[in-house]
Amino acid sequence: AEGGVRVGFCGRFPGGERGLWNRDDLFSVCIRIPREVKGIGKRFCARPFPSTLILSPPGGGKTTLLRDMVRTLSDGGMRVGLCDERGEIAALSAGSCGFDIGERTDVLSDCPKARAAMILLRCMSPELIAMDEISEPEDAGACRSAAYCGVSLLATAHAADAEELSRRDVYQRLLRGKVFFRAIVIRCA
């Protein structure tokens, strides 16, 4: 959605190719309004930057921290490639970002993360590739491919801690392959 706002719907799934919701089919709506909190990621952004995975349950602030770390690293001189599949990190609209993501950040928005990572890697010469919510095998595969091409990674995943993460199939190859060297766990009170 515009400005990085996320809207979730629940109720009777409409199905079909277009998946249009009828107001009579809705049971609940969740509106998540993003915010920019500058400075929260600074302490995690020392150089050289180790590939880092940010963990928390849904709604824990992963995207907010990711956005600030991207900005901090980019303004600190690092070339960053940002895979913004759902348009919620940079909030790109008409060629302008709705959030400050740094001077040296190239954004690929509304493109599947796995494809965006490979395009950024081949075309934009990043030192760091950042993406939100690794959840599909294709996302994990893109992380592995990028990590073995000499770039650092910054990504998020839904998990309460590293142990919980390690129990999920999609992350096991990432952990075994030592794709990420550090995890930042956001504890929700």
Which residue stretches match the model-derived regions?
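A general structural motif
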Residues: E36-I40, V107-R115, I134
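Hydrophobic anchor at the beta1->P-loop junction of P-loop NTPases
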Residues: I54
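The conserved Walker
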Residues: P58-G59
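Conserved lysine of the Walker
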Residues: K62
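P-loop NTP-binding catalytic core
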Residues: A1-F49
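Hydrophobic positions on the alpha1 helix immediately C-terminal to the Walker A/P-loop
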Residues: L65, M69
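P-loop NTPase switch/communication element
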Residues: S74-M118
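Conserved P-loop NTPase nucleotide-binding/switch module
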Residues: M124-R182, C188
